[in-house]
Amino acid sequence: MTLAALPWGTKALFGSISDSVPLGGYTKRYYIVLACIMLSAVAGVLASAEEISAREAAGLFCLGNLAICIVDLLIEGKYSELMRTRGEGRSDIVTFVWLMVMFGGLLASVIAGPLADQGIIQPLAWGALVMALLPILPLLFGWLPEEKQVGCCMTGKLRQNRGIFFLALVMSLAAFSIAMATLFGSSYSKLFTSLGASLLLITIADKTLPPVLSSCNLFMFVVEVSSISLGGALQYFFVAPETCLADGPHFSYVFFTTWASVIGAFFGLLGLMIFQWRLSHWNVRKIFYLTTFLRIFAAIFDIAMVQRWNTNELGIDDHTFFVLGDAIVSPVISMISFLPLVMLTSKLCSAGLESTTYSVLAGFQNLGSIVSRSAGSFVIGQLGMQTTTCPYSFDNLGTGIAVCNMAMPLLVIPFARFLLPNARLDEPLYEWFQGSGDLRSALTSDEMWLANTSSGSEEEDVVTITAIEKIAAENQEKIEIDERDLDL
């Protein structure tokens, strides 16, 4: 699974390549076409192979995930661009994209789940082949809005934004190092490798990213790290057979992986609609305060099941209580917590570098998740939980959830006060920050001098912003002239 998930850690590298090297004059269209062809080829091999080894399957899933993460990244870059140029900071685009993602997940759970449970795998692979080819037609018809670029390599963009490109390269190398530590090392080595990579990347980000981008990026990393994942132990607790855990829920895999996922996908859609209708206009800090307390509330359901309060104290059977908590409440809260991160990430993307910037920001969030899971594995071992041989032991799991999923997330609150903007989520943050979130990521020394001479008065700040925009436009013209000269 580590090898299969490796491409998601290298998204920043592919974002840099697509932003700086147009393919056929486009930075997204033909990259997505090639990714769809690659994914269909992987599905075709899986569908037609009579027998396949574990290593071959891991390699194929790695290629498949590479294709999926390229499509995912480039679409994220495109809707980040549309939010800046057309959306005026509104959440409609993000909500629509994730509505489609959630609907697709719901459809996949309904169709693929029951078939996979019955061992019907190859027909699913043939279906995946067809689905992988479907996006190619609208792309070739030009339905993805994108202007054709001049030149085969945007060397001016590379020179002007070498800091973020360097960060993207280091991030990809760090992801590879963590994958190797996971494959060949212990839980300790994975934890220390991920922590070391995090500190290195945070330091580089502080030096190469604009202050606003760097501080918001650090906050999103802290959000992921603050809720230490004990999901591995919880999954064993839920599905452990009676022979290994006498007083457990004893869920079947069909219920746990299929039907709970179907219910969860439906209520995830409900969470998306609640965010769009009620929360998308909230203050950035306040919405993260709210989501922090909601995540803490969701952890109560897991503690209640682990401590058996639902059956012994409340008289609610395990299946009903699990559906109420993990399949209804948790998906709603997860979506409400997730969408503000997506909105903030999209708003902070630099013009012309949407894929690179998004991949770097999302990469830090993924890195935070890796640290969270690594720390969770360490905590599970330290608390003496036994999940490898029968009988299983989860005596300290409730305490672990209380500390890791209820106390630790409270650390986010002071970080939100100092690292996040005091603005509404639907405001165009790149304007609210006087250019810092968008324009400043490409400022030259002249522009930085102007930005630093702002006195703080509204009238003079407007003059400063206008001057910065003028110089930035002139610099962009120079870059385009240089690129045309190189092409000639």
Where are these regions (language model features)?
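Glycine-rich segments within core transmembrane alpha-helices of 12-TM secondary carriers
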Residues: 4-12, 68, 88-116, 260-267, ...
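Intracellular loop-helix junctions on the cytosolic face of multi-pass helical membrane proteins
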Residues: 41, 50-52, 56-57, 84-235, ...
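Intracellular juxtamembrane helix-capping segments at the cytosolic ends
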Residues: 68-84, 334-356
